[in-house]
Amino acid sequence: MLCPVLLCATLLLLTPFEVTEARALHPSADAVQFVEQFLDRYNDLLTLDDLENLLNTQPEEQSTLSSGVKTAEYPKWADLQTQPETPWFRLLKGALTNQKRAEPDRSRRGWNRGCFGLKLDRIGSMSGLGC
């Protein structure tokens, strides 16, 4: 019992009491310039929330556009319908629709029932080993 206490005491005595100096990191001008250029170039891309809003409100916007409402009342991303779809936009749009389509299917299935339905093992865990 005395040995761990002595070991801790010696370790505390051996640690330096002075605060060592650390060099502050200053971003270089090249790094700052690169980040600014990167943000300027990719700032106008769609976020996932914008894409979801675009997919969810697309039929509503078509009906309001045909009714003669001014286009200045619409958000910035409403003009994307007139532009040709880029490959990235199609990829993200397809992935989002596939994800939404697959989600209810998974929740509806529930447990894997197998051939003979659910089985309760001896330890109380569920298994679908029926075949």
Curated annotation (Swiss-Prot):
List the SMART domains: NAT_PEP
Gene Ontology MF annotations: hormone activity; hormone receptor binding
Q: Which GO terms describe its cellular component?
A: extracellular region
Which pairs of Cys residues are joined through disulfide bonds in the record?
C115-C131
Q: Which InterPro entries match?
A: C_natriurtcpep, Natr_peptide, Natr_peptide_CS
- Where is it mainly found? secreted
Top-level lineage group: Eukaryota
What family is it from?
A: Belongs to the natriuretic peptide family.
Function summary:
Exhibits natriuretic and vasodepressant activity. Has cGMP-stimulating activity. May help to regulate body fluid homeostasis in a variety of aquatic environments.
This chain belongs to the protein called: C-type natriuretic peptide 1
Gene encoding it? cnp-1
